[in-house]
């Protein structure tokens, strides 16, 4: 009997949660013909935030994350201010016949004011978005142009897709 009340309480309390630092996209496609790519970050909080950003690999088979440099890796973003995170190629070789994918992590760390004898719980929100490097050899190609290379199949109650194209594909309804 108490589980429905817990679920209702959780739903009501979640409406008050918000991220202070908002990233300006769900993915960043790095054009191989350019030297860098930029994504915006905005502080929607009433206090300053420290913004920390870094790259991580998608899986063990991913190219090394040191193929890029994030600048600035750590900076202060005042209340209501917009900033930019720039991703720059380091010169390390990446495959030029297919896309490479990494995770771009952008964490907003809110400022706190020390108040003696008061307990405070505070969360730092980490936004994890896709960084897709599209080599110069694939410039102008779109996922739609490679749709016929997808192999669709059925396994019991699920649908499987094998991607034989050099591009990463995203699906939505």
Regions found by a protein language model. Give the residues of each.
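Positively charged n-region of N-terminal signal peptides that target proteins for export
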Residues: 1-4
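N-terminal signal peptide c-region/cleavage motif recognized by signal peptidases
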Residues: 13-16
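Beta-sheet-dominated interaction scaffolds and their linkers
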Residues: 19-40, 141-154
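Buried hydrophobic-core signal for structured, non-transmembrane domains
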Residues: 37-43, 87, 102-106, 158-163
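Short acidic, flexible loop segments centered on an aromatic residue
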Residues: 44-62, 165-173
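Intrinsically disordered, low-complexity Pro/Gly/Ser/Thr-rich segments with frequent PxxP/GP/PP motifs
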Residues: 62-94
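Terminal connector regions
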Residues: 92-138
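Intrinsically disordered, low-complexity segments enriched in serine, threonine, and glycine
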Residues: 148, 153-173
């Amino acid at each position: 009997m108490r589980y429905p009340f817990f679920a209702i309480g959780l739903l009501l309390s979640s409406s008050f949660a918000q991220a202070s630092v908002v990233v300006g996209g769900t993915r960043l496609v790095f054009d191989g013909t350019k030297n860098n790519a930029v994504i915006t970050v905005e502080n929607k909080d009433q206090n300053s935030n420290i913004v920390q950003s870094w790259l991580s690999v998608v899986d063990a088979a991913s190219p090394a994350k040191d193929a890029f440099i994030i600048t600035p890796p750590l900076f202060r973003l005042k209340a209501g201010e917009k900033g930019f995170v720039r991703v720059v190629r380091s010169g390390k070789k990446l495959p030029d016949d297919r896309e490479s994918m990494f995770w771009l992590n952008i964490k907003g760390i809110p400022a706190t004011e020390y108040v003696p004898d008061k307990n405070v719980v505070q969360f730092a929100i980490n936004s994890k978005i896709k960084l897709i490097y599209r080599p110069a050899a694939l410039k102008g190609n779109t996922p739609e142009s490679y749709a016929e290379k997808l192999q669709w199949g059925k396994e019991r109650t699920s649908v499987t897709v094998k991607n034989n194209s050099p591009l990463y594909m995203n699906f939505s309804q």
